[in-house]
């Protein structure tokens, strides 16, 4: 009887694993590989930096951190 219980538990784990794989796995956090640093969005919301396409004189002024007389989104 104990062997049957263990067998049923193993079968349940295998079936749930298979269902998880078929659905595409667990929901994963999407990573934005193009972002230079993450605090940029927070700085922009708080008004601590200039958003992209805004005028600038140094990279520290821009939320994206890239200044060429205006804030650029990418380097």
From Swiss-Prot:
Residues 1-19 form the signal peptide. Its main location: secreted. It is found in: Secreted. The keyword Secreted applies. Keywords: Disulfide bond, Knottin, Neurotoxin, Secreted, Signal, Toxin. The keyword Signal applies. Expressed by the venom duct. GO terms for cellular component: extracellular region. Disulfide bonds join 49-63, 56-67, 62-71. The presence of a 'disulfide through disulfide knot' structurally defines this protein as a knottin. This is Conotoxin TsMEKL-011.
């Amino acid at each position: 009887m104990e062997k049957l219980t263990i067998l049923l538990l193993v079968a349940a784990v295998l079936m749930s694993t298979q269902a998880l794989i078929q659905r595409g796995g667990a929901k994963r956090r999407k990573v934005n590989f193009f972002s230079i640093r993450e605090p940029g969005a927070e700085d922009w919301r708080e008004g601590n930096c200039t958003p992209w396409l805004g005028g600038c004189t140094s990279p520290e002024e821009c939320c994206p951190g890239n200044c060429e007389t205006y804030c650029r989104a990418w380097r």
